[in-house]
């Protein structure tokens, strides 16, 4: 008997356990001796017990290849799997072959190894104990076929193994041989009764059918015919028709980024004509595009995949793009085994929501078993809804005697569409609000599909809504379950119709959410206000800060000071009324953050700008550009055409990024807000001094010729930490007289550049009056700018009065006013934190920091402030009484009555 090692491929879907996680431990990787990611331990009784084994080689996790990756990357991928992990592993197995004659054993073994090679379906696997690579095995297989081409009719029994191949063992599947055409199989399904279902869910995937010799793809050599296209410019290609794909490519404007999966078997491009040619003489590619609207699982990107949620944007052309259906996983030609139970549904993070058209249900891509139900709405719909944007909207109950009763709607039906509005990507809250808003007596047309098995699994796994938001206002915690947050916090929303605090809490005012940490791990769970409630609270916060009563407002702030600050006036400057109106209009127009901003986790495709805040920012920028000029470049400032102040053009930042360099920016915190708004997402590093004396010693050691005031720099650093900490990517302490902080700074920039970041889900809509250009749209003609120092750079800066290290120390809030446009190392002492709703993110562009001028008597200002604070305090108290509750507990709402 001869012994041969083959590799079996298994796929298992694991549900995360709250205490045990996925129940596995992994080790190895490219940075280890083994080279492969291996399952090192399986927790008894965990989700993986009985499904995975110790020693399994991890091949793929949620569509992300684990071949030739580091162990850190593999662990990070598993951490980003919030609920489910679809893990594909390969497992070695030794089989015994009967001994063959000497003359045929070589050919027989070679044929067996060749068949095993063809059955792998992924790069880098070893199919025998030899450990030879795929390329070597491919060359060996091709050579073997050429040598044996003339003797196929005279094979011994051992030689027949090449023609017949290995039988399927333990669910092991082989990709079709490239030199053997598959024979088409015709299958006819006939329904005997109306209740019978075909039981087939179709899926599709865009692939590269042909590459022209004269195109860029042929010269780039990074693409091959047969490659599966997973993403086009960051948008998932799953379920996109050819027209949608063509439109997406046309919008790329000169730069096309494709994420592809290499099909080693060249299966799609080698389908025989009998299969690829349809009766209507359309190409095989057109056939696939017609089926591309069927539901299947999203294919994650090559980076840690963004969490599943839906993106909704209206397309002005009014075309309809079919949505995917929740339940089943796509059968990729590279998959080799399917488990018996269906995978939990997961939607792509880059779904496109189109305006519905007047097409029929079948034209929209719905399955043939979908049904259309029509009835007139009464006082209520009579349906109980469950699910959400992550799995779809399902019927969990029908009220007896309601208009929907008797129409054939059952528990477990998925609502695909209501009155030409697709429901596949709506949250449960949005679906309920849409149905409730329908006037009584109006005809309701529902397109439903029977998905009872998916509904049952959804209820058991307690999934529904799933998307991520970033907050842009502050809220205090309301025990026991209400979460507090500051600007910039990220939450994972799990239910958009969560009951309020206490057993009698009403639905419709709160979301169930989990706070996300800086390490992308989930933290505490609780409730937060829903979208409409958040808008009210954010408006109230803005009004409070306008009169100096809001969170974080400075002691010396007032309504009059806010009035002059919005007009971009600085001390001693005499601007015309027209100029002030233009500045205020620009601040209102250029940007506006919602209270909750939908975000996704993506990898930066460009070198992110670097903003260094703190008392050593000037020294750090000089050292970085001098030491690493090929990695860093200082963004030069230019004078305004209508004023002596200086600005930094966004086009300058773009040009530096195109050179594959980090743009070093000396800008104010308000300019950092603007950079985030235009989706540059800078790396903001704050250098925190220990004390004023330590800072003075450090600056004298780093820059002996510098005459900058250590007391002033220290006071400004304290102000930055107090009011702009939500902008910091990292904080580096300044200790002693060493360059440890500088080494940490370089390490932070390197690490943050490789980490995924929370980016806006929707692109910024540009106004025709706004010259702002986004990074992905090109900034060649941009006139957008950032605020920087408006004076000539000098080491000795007293701002018109004595301010040296020899002066006595005063409180940081009592320092003298600074000019309107200051560098990041010199923020305005009287500046108070403003939400993006207040300054429209463009305060850096117009210089919103100003001094307070005593145009009115102090008594009148105090009277105005006191009256405004008392009025708003009463309003805020009433709002907080509604928001908070002394009763404990919150509940996850699985369904909502209508």
UniProtKB/Swiss-Prot annotation:
The UniProt entry's coiled-coil ranges are none
Its predominant location is: membrane
How this chain sits in the membrane, per its record, is:
Peripheral membrane protein
Q: Where would I find the Guanylate kinase-like domain in this sequence?
A: 569-750
Residue stretches of biased makeup (Low complexity): 780-790
Q: Which CDD domains match?
A: PDZ1_ZO1-like, PDZ2_ZO1-like_ds, PDZ3_ZO1-like_domain
Cellular localisation: Cell membrane; Cell junction, Tight junction; Nucleus
Q: Which residues carry this modification: Phosphoserine?
A: 128, 156, 161, 195, 313, 321, 360, 580, 835, 884-885
Question: Which residue positions does Phosphothreonine occur at?
Answer: 319
Q: Where is the PDZ domain?
A: 11-93, 187-264, 369-435
Query: Which Gene Ontology BP terms does the record give?
Result: cell-cell adhesion; cell-cell junction organization; establishment of endothelial intestinal barrier; positive regulation of blood-brain barrier permeability; protein localization to cell-cell junction
Role summary: TJP1, TJP2, and TJP3 are closely related scaffolding proteins that link tight junction (TJ) transmembrane proteins such as claudins, junctional adhesion molecules, and occludin to the actin cytoskeleton. The tight junction acts to limit movement of substances through the paracellular space and as a boundary between the compositionally distinct apical and basolateral plasma membrane domains of epithelial and endothelial cells. Binds and recruits PATJ to tight junctions where it connects and stabilizes apical and lateral components of tight junctions.
Tell me its family.
Belongs to the MAGUK family.
Q: How does it assemble?
A: Heterodimer with TJP1. Interacts with UBN1. Interacts with occludin OCLN and claudins. Interacts with PATJ. Interacts with FASLG. Interacts with CCND1.
The protein in question is named Tight junction protein ZO-3
Please spell out the taxonomic lineage of the organism that makes this protein: Eukaryota, Metazoa, Chordata, Craniata, Vertebrata
């Amino acid at each position: 008997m001869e012994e041969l090692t083959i590799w079996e491929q298994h796929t298992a879907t694991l549900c995360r356990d709250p205490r045990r996680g996925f129940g596995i431990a992994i080790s190895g990787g490219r940075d280890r001796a083994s080279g492969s990611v291996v399952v090192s331990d399986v927790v008894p009784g965990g989700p993986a017990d009985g499904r995975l084994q110790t020693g399994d080689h991890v091949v793929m996790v949620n569509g992300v290849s684990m071949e030739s990756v580091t162990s850190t990357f593999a662990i990070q991928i598993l951490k980003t799997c919030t609920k489910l992990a679809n893990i594909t592993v390969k497992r070695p197995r030794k089989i015994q072959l009967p001994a063959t004659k000497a003359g045929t054993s070589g050919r027989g073994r070679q044929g067996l190894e060749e068949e095993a090679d063809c059955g792998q379906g992924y790069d880098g696997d070893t199919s025998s104990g030899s450990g030879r690579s795929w390329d070597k095995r491919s060359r060996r297989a091709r050579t073997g076929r050429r040598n044996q081409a003339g003797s196929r009719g005279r094979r011994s029994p051992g030689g027949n193994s090449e023609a017949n191949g290995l039988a399927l063992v333990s669910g092991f599947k082989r990709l079709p041989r490239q030199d053997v055409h598959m024979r088409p199989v015709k299958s006819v399904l006939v329904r005997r009764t109306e209740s019978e279902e075909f039981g087939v869910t179709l899926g599709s995937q865009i692939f590269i059918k042909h590459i022209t010799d004269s195109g860029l793809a042929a010269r780039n050599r990074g693409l091959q015919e047969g490659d599966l296209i997973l993403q086009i410019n960051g948008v998932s290609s799953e379920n996109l028709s050819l027209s949608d794909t063509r439109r997406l490519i046309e919008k790329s404007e000169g730069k096309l980024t494709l994420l592809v999966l290499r099909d080693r078997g060249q299966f799609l491009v080698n389908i025989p004509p009998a299969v690829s040619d349809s009766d209507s003489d359309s190409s095989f590619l057109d056939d696939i595009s017609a089926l591309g609207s069927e539901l299947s699982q999203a294919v994650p990107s090559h980076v840690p995949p963004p969490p599943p949620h839906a993106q909704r944007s209206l397309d002005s052309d009014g075309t309809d793009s079919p949505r995917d259906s929740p339940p089943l996983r796509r059968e990729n030609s590279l998959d080799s085994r399917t488990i018996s139970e269906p995978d939990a549904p997961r939607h792509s993070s880059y779904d496109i929501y189109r305006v519905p058209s007047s097409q029929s249900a079948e034209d929209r891509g719905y399955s043939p078993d979908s049904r259309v139900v029509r009835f007139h709405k009464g006082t209520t719909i009579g349906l109980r809804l469950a699910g959400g944007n992550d799995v779809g909207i399902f019927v969990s109950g029908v009220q007896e005697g309601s208009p929907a009763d008797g129409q054939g709607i059952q528990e477990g039906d998925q609502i695909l569409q209501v009155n030409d509005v697709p429901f596949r990507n709506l949250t449960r809250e949005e679906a309920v609000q849409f149905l409730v808003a329908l006037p009584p007596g109006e005809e309701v047309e529902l397109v439903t599909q029977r998905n009872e098995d998916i509904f049952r699994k959804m209820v058991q796994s307690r999934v529904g809504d799933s998307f991520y938001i970033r907050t842009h206002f502050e809220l205090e915690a309301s025990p026991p379950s209400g979460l507090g947050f500051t600007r910039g916090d990220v939450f994972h929303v799990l239910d958009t119709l969560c009951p309020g605090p206490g057993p009698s809490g009403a639905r419709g005012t709160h979301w169930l959410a989990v706070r996300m940490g800086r390490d992308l791990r989930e933290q505490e769970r609780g409730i937060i206000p829903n979208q409409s409630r958040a808008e009210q609270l954010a408006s109230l916060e803005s009004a409070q800060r306008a009169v100096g009563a809001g969170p974080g407002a400075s002691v010396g702030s007032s309504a009059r000071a806010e009035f002059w600050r919005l007009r971009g006036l600085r001390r001693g400057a005499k601007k015309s009324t027209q100029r002030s109106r233009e500045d205020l209009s620009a601040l209102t127009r250029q940007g506006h953050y919602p209270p909750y901003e939908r975000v996704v986790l993506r990898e930066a495709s460009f070198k992110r700008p670097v903003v260094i805040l703190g008392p050593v920012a000037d020294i750090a920028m000089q050292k970085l550009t001098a030491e690493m000029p090929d990695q860093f470049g200082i963004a030069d400032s230019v004078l305004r055409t209508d004023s002596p102040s200086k600005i930094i053009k966004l086009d300058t930042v773009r040009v530096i990024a195109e050179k594959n360099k980090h743009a070093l920016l000396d800008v104010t915190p308000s300019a950092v807000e603007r950079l985030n708004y235009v989706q540059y997402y800078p790396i903001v590093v704050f250098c925190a001094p220990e004390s004023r004396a330590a800072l003075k010693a450090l600056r004298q050691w780093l820059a002996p010729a510098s005459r900058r005031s250590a007391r002033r720099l220290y006071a400004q650093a304290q102000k930055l930490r107090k009011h702009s900490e939500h902008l910091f990517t990292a904080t580096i302490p300044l200790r002693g007289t060493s360059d440890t902080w500088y080494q940490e700074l370089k390490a932070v920039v390197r690490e943050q550049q490789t980490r995924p970041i929370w980016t806006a889900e929707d692109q910024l809509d540009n106004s025709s009056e706004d010259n702002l250009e986004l990074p992905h749209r090109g900034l060649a003609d941009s006139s957008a700018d950032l605020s920087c120092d408006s004076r000539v750079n000098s080491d000795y800066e007293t701002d018109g009065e004595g301010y040296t290290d020899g002066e006595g120390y005063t409180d940081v809030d009592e320092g003298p006013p600074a000019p309107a446009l200051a560098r990041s190392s010199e923020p305005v002492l009287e500046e108070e934190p403003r939400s993006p709703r207040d300054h429209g993110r463009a305060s850096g562009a117009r210089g919103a920091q100003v001094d307070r001028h005593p145009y009115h008597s102090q008594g009148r200002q105090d009277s105005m402030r006191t009256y405004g604070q008392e009025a708003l305090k009463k309003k805020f108290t009433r709002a907080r009484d509604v928001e908070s509750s002394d009763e404990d507990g919150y509940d996850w709402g699985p369904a909502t009555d209508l």
